[in-house]
């Protein structure tokens, strides 16, 4: 049975931890507001660019741009994983890494067995996990979310498109967390390349005049589209991470509060038992002296 001193030490330690988790919750909440704003602001531009590309791709021969042309025989797959740099965010990293593992080892099991699956990992947690297990990592971006910048998204998009054009990848998939709400991020495995015309835009029926020509414009739009999509996914993942961390720290703070309540009850009971024992010993001693 723990002594009064043991219980006091535990109470002190839990109070200290509770202060840390409460502070981390407040920091995550502040970061979430900023991250959520950036993710929401990126959606209209990315969506409109996707719509324009869909309209154009419906009017040109997809063979004019190889990034629009799908390949019948998919032998090589590039998986872009967007995870977090840090932990203490609940099951955020665990869930996204599990999905990436499923995509690599199950969805494309044949390509994986033949060494045809490679990865680009953004975020320290995903990069460290797959590097230690011997997966083929083309590029890694640890600590990318410490100073999130569009240039990284552009570099990832250029690497992916370059590999596709050189035949080093027949399909490019991005695995990330899409931010829907604080309590409900959505795990997604989304095709980035090839750009499918039917998925590129919802409304391709508009009557537009293109200058100089759809083919020239599409060559300009495709790189912008890829960079913008990767950037949007990184912003979505960052917002989902902050939401997960805020929720996890809130839960930890509440758990600490409940544990403190239980320990205080145990401490008071132990203290009361010790006082009762001392009083009983005093009374017994007094009775012995009388006799």
UniProtKB/Swiss-Prot annotation:
One of the protein's GO biological processes: proton motive force-driven plasma membrane ATP synthesis
GO CC entries: plasma membrane; proton-transporting ATP synthase complex
Annotated family: Belongs to the ATPase gamma chain family.
Membrane topology term: Peripheral membrane protein
Function: Produces ATP from ADP in the presence of a proton gradient across the membrane. The gamma chain is believed to be important in regulating ATPase activity and the flow of protons through the CF(0) complex.
Listed Gene3D superfamilies: 3.40.1380.10, ATP synthase, gamma subunit, helix hairpin domain (1.10.287.80)
Protein name: ATP synthase gamma chain
């Amino acid at each position: 049975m723990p002594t009064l001193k043991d219980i006091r030490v535990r109470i002190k330690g839990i109070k200290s931890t509770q202060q840390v988790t409460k502070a981390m919750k407040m920091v995550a909440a502040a970061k979430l507001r900023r991250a959520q704003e950036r993710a929401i602001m990126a959606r209209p531009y990315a969506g409109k660019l996707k719509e324009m590309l869909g309209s154009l791709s419906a009017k040109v021969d997809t063979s004019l741009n190889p990034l629009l042309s799908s390949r019948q025989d998919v032998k090589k797959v590039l998986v872009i994983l967007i995870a977090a740099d840090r932990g203490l965010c609940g099951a955020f990293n665990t869930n996204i890494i599990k999905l990436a593992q499923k995509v690599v080892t199950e969805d494309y099991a044949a390509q994986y067995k033949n060494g045809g699956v490679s990865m680009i990992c953004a975020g320290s947690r995903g990069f460290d996990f797959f590097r230690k297990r011997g997966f083929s990592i083309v590029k890694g971006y640890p600590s990318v979310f410490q100073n999130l910048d569009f240039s990284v998204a552009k570099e990832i998009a250029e690497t992916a498109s370059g590999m596709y054009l050189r035949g080093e990848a027949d399909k490019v998939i991005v695995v990330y967390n899409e931010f829907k709400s604080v309590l409900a991020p959505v795990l997604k495995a989304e095709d980035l390349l090839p750009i499918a015309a039917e998925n590129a835009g919802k409304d391709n029926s508009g009557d537009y005049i293109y200058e100089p020509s759809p083919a020239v414009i599409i060559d300009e739009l495709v790189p912008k589209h890829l960079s913008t999509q990767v950037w949007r996914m990184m912003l979505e993942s960052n917002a989902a991470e902050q939401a997960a961390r805020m929720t996890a720290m809130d839960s930890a703070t509440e758990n600490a509060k409940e544990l403190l309540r239980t320990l205080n009850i145990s401490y008071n009971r132990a203290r009361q038992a010790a006082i009762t024992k001392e009083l009983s010993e005093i009374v017994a001693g007094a009775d012995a002296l009388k006799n």
